[in-house]
Curated annotation (Swiss-Prot):
This is Small ribosomal subunit protein bS20. Binds directly to 16S ribosomal RNA. GO terms for cellular component: cytosol; small ribosomal subunit. Belongs to the bacterial ribosomal protein bS20 family. One of its GO terms (molecular function) is small ribosomal subunit rRNA binding. Keywords: Ribonucleoprotein, Ribosomal protein, RNA-binding, rRNA-binding. It comes from Mycoplasmopsis synoviae (strain 53) (Mycoplasma synoviae). The lineage of its organism: Bacteria, Bacillati, Mycoplasmatota, Mycoplasmoidales, Metamycoplasmataceae. InterPro entries: Ribosomal_bS20, Ribosomal_bS20_sf. One of its GO terms (biological process) is translation. The gene is rpsT.
């Protein structure tokens, strides 16, 4: 445990950021999972859920929780999965 007052505050700040970042990452994972499940079930809401997943990924990238390239990769792979299953 830190003894310096500023470092104690820093630990608290880091913990707050960690919790927020974990929540954002969890939202992204849930959105992607729901979109993939809807795609596999040929649900009529699949396109809507894919758009929601893209939105969550974009928010995570803009907040700096996810790297730009990782966000682009996740969006691209979700689109590829959607298009591949839609044509079958």
């Amino acid at each position: 445990m830190a003894n310096i007052k500023s470092k104690i505050k820093n630990i608290s700040r880091i913990e707050t950021a960690r919790v927020k970042n974990a929540a954002i990452k969890s939202r992204v994972k849930k959105a992607i999972r729901k979109a993939r499940e809807a795609i596999l079930e040929n649900s009529p809401k699949a396109q809507e859920l894919v758009n929601k997943a893209h939105h969550e990924i974009g928010k995570a990238v803009s907040k700096g929780v996810m790297h730009l390239n990782k966000g682009a990769r996740k969006s691209s792979r979700l689109d590829l999965f959607y298009n591949k299953t839609k044509t079958q």
